[in-house]
Regions:
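Long, low-complexity or tandemly repetitive, helically biased scaffold regions used
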Residues: 2-103
Length: 103
């Protein structure tokens, strides 16, 4: 596999993680709004861990390399990081609502 193929597959994989996390974020926020349980919490945490790990692997591959991350790869990593942050914020909102509801 050439460098261009590797970059293309990396971007596609990162974009897939970002899309999946975006969908999961909406699910958690729907649970916040409706004050219902999060239906697939283990799957969400698993996806968050996998996405984070893939970003870490990309940074390790390119760290100190003479060819730095391409702008497209950087943007794909940023999309994943944004969605990870969104999911974490949604869980904070969920826990805040749960505390108010139970208390």
């Amino acid at each position: 596999m050439g460098d261009a193929d590797f970059v293309r597959e990396t971007i596609q994989s990162l974009n897939s993680h970002a899309a999946e996390l975006g969908s999961m974020y909406r699910e958690v926020m729907a649970s916040v709004k409706n004050r219902t349980e999060i239906p697939n919490v283990k799957d969400i945490f698993k996806e968050m861990a996998e996405a984070s790990r893939e970003c870490d692997e990309m940074l390790e591959i390119y760290y100190g390399d003479e060819d730095p991350l391409t702008p497209d790869v950087r943007r794909a990593i940023q999309r994943v990081q944004d969605q990870l942050s969104n999911c974490a914020s949604a869980f904070v909102a969920y826990m805040a609502i749960a505390r108010l509801t139970l208390g």
